[in-house]
Amino acid sequence: MNKMEYLSIFGFVSVLYLIIRVDARAYEVNGIDQSKVGFDDNYVVTWGQNNVLKLNQGKEVQLSLDHSSGSGFESKNHYESGFFQIRIKVPPKDTSGVVTAFYLTSKGNTHDEVDFEFLGNKEGKLAVQTNVFTNGKGNREQKLALWFDPSKDFHTYAILWNPYQIVLYVDNIPVRVFKNTTSQGMNYPSKPMQVVVSLWNGENWATDGGKSKINWSLAPFKANFQGFNNSGCFTNAEKNACGSSAYWWNTGSYSKLSDSEQKAYTNVRQKYMNYDYCSDKVRFHVPPSECKWNN
């Protein structure tokens, strides 16, 4: 075994170790068997009805994108805090221009939003882009190359949103943290948001800056989803109740990453993140104010 092979194997084992060691608190306390929660319990199809297929008695949903339409669904409820997760298997092979999205969003021009977006690619790994909008302002993109092929099998993607922080997880590993720094004069998502999932045509920007278009001869493109339970505080709850520590995701242990989560997060940033708006000196001569708190 040469040195490069050894380092490659060592790096892979290190990632596995961190995945095993990372504190999966958010997955343990929920206590609900995901396999028993059906699509219709929490979600409704919102567009592209002809491109939505319910499988396994509603325990799995397949979205399709063809030349006529993409498709999507959203949660029946609006939330003001919570832990939201879903299992996704994205379309395989050449998916240039195809976007698979899982996100939280409010409505209107001054909306809040927290995004997972899988940006299609030619043969090979696709990029995962995350973004955070506050009062209609985004431009907070980060991109990473996952340590697995998300088209081969289902993986779990989750968003923790509480009064302290927003954390995006991939298979229990934190891949993004956005802290509540309103005390420092910054904005933080606070509007009631729905969970939205979609498969759509993003060829004008998603791959190579829009240079690589969708190869429609490969359509339809199909993405599959499982695990439709949400742990969230409904908007119609008593005023200010959604920030209460009576909800497990608002307790002090979720006010910051655990030590093991922090180690895993640092590993992701060092090895897998290939774009961070906070480091983009072309777009931002001075890093946005929130960067010093979130990095």
From Swiss-Prot:
Top-level taxon of the source organism: Eukaryota
EC number from the UniProt entry: 2.4.1.207
Compartments (UniProt record): Secreted, Cell wall; Secreted, Extracellular space, Apoplast
GO terms for biological process, alphabetical: cell wall biogenesis; cell wall organization; xyloglucan metabolic process
Domain GH16: 27-225
Keyword Cell wall biogenesis/degradation: yes
Protein name: Putative xyloglucan endotransglucosylase/hydrolase protein 1
Taxonomic source organism: Arabidopsis thaliana
